[in-house]
Amino acid sequence: MPRSLKKGPFIDIKLEKRILDMNSRSEKKVLKTWSRSTMISPDFVGHTIAVHNGKTHVPVYVSDNMVGHKLGEFAPTRTFRGHAGGKAEKGGSAPKRK
């Protein structure tokens, strides 16, 4: 369920303050954040934000079409290592019956 319109988007206050401060100084550097639920605003465009995925910080370069999404959408938390490789590793299917 989406957030109520009367509440407005959630943006971490400290992160927004750091971004606006960097915009005023026209500075670009990587910002670390643990706030995956922060919605991306137009002020964030052009910055690289390192979003925590539970283990490391994943660098996310914010572009125009990311506005309105949340930071956590661009830092996957799970790694897919493949399914069990029983038959696929052997290179063939089961032998045919006669």
Swiss-Prot record:
Say if the entry is tagged with keyword Ribonucleoprotein.
yes
* Gene Ontology molecular functions: rRNA binding; structural constituent of ribosome
Query: Which GO terms fall under biological process for this protein?
Result: ribosomal small subunit assembly; translation
A GO cellular component annotated for this chain's UniProt record is: cytoplasm
Keyword RNA-binding included in the entry's annotation: yes
What keywords appear on the UniProt entry? Ribonucleoprotein, Ribosomal protein, RNA-binding, rRNA-binding
**Where does the record place the region Disordered?**
77-98
* InterPro entries tied to this protein: Ribosomal_uS19, Ribosomal_uS19_bac-type, Ribosomal_uS19_CS, Ribosomal_uS19_SF
- Give the superkingdom in one word: Bacteria
What is stated as this protein's family in its record? Answer: Belongs to the universal ribosomal protein uS19 family.
Protein task: Protein S19 forms a complex with S13 that binds strongly to the 16S ribosomal RNA.
Return the protein name.
Small ribosomal subunit protein uS19
- Which species does the entry assign this protein to? Chlorobium luteolum (strain DSM 273 / BCRC 81028 / 2530)
